[in-house]
Each structure stands twice: as structure tokens, then as C-alpha cells.
Amino acid sequence: MKRVRIGVVGCGAIAQVHHLPNLAALDEQFDVAVVCDVSPRAAADAARRFHVPRHVTDWRDLLDTDLDAVLLCHTDPKTEAAIAVLQAGKHLFIEKPLCFSLDEIDALIAAQAAAGTVAQAGYMKVYDPAFELAQRAVRDIDRVRFVQVNHLHPDNALHLRQFDIRRFDDVSVQVVERTRAERSAAVRRAIGDVSPMVQRTFNLLSGSAIHDLYG
């Protein structure tokens, strides 16, 4: 069986904890050909740890390669990169949140339809061993009469402490400021000029808590 050649954009916590280890474990099916991060050291370290032959710092460098698919798990917004990946004729796996507005999702849908490739949202929790265990436990119950689910959101540091997550400080100030400005502009287009509390709620619901929000 031909392995799927993949490029991974974003070498932060979610890539180090979930995506790159899982792709490495499934190496009979997937070939991670290149990783990308705005931090040169993060990209180089991920390439070394997960035996990836190439690393770059600009996602645009992936578009003219012979990749079959691109996994986007970098800092939001991801819409520009996602549309470019689809327009390059590649399959797309995009981490949550896909985008912040209906206009953006309409543009993504149109790009996917025009490309004829697969675009998938990254609900990796569906395949989390803990979730699969809970699913099996529920199946064994003869008759379910009541279900209550509480979503607790403590400081991520408590959860991430158990993993070997590498963080680097070599991203230029210009790149950091540009990324923050792009994200702020995308959020503003989605919800307008709102109070800090509303913006914080929006960030929570479109970030970690998105596992529990459906539309």
C-alpha cells in the first residue's frame, strides 16, 4: 500500500503530544516528509525527534512539493493556509478551530469543492483511548436512563506537565506581532468590538472547549 506523504505545519504542543507521535506509530500508512514552524529550532527539533527528513519555517514552502496531504495545527488563523493547501490540490487535515466566521467556512467549503480533495476537521478526541473506553462501557449498559457530562477546564499546565514538550524562544518579534494582529483581526471580523469578557468567552469556546460545541 502506498503511504500518504504528509507535511505538518505547527510543531507546538498538540503536534508533539498527539499528531507527530501518532503518525510515527502509523508509519506503514503515513510518511511525514516535512515539518514546518515559525520557530526554526522547533521545526528542527521536531524533525530530529520524529525522523522527518526536512523542516521549513514557512508553510508556503509546502505547496509546491509532492505531498499528498497537509496537517495544519499552527496558531490561528489558519484560513489562508487551508485555502492555499486545497488550491494546491492537496488533502487537508485542520486542527480546531477551523476558522472564526461563516464567511471563512464558506470560503473553505468552496475551495474544497473546487479542489475535489478531502478536508477534515481535527477531532482527534474521537479516537482518544479514554473516550473509546467510555464508549465501550456505555455499550455494556443494558438501558441508559440518564447521562451527565461535566467539562472541567483547569490550567493546561497540569495536563501538559506529563509530556516532554519542547518550547523555543527564537521566533522574531515581528512574526509574533503579525500573528497576534492577524488573530485579533479575524476575531474582530467574527464578533466585532466586544468587551474583554466576551472576547475571553469566545476564545475559550473556539479553543479548548470546542470539543463540546456543535452547530
Give residue ranges: language-model regions.
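Beta-loop-alpha module in the N-terminal Rossmann-like domain of NAD(P)-dependent dehydrogenases
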Residues: 45, 50-111
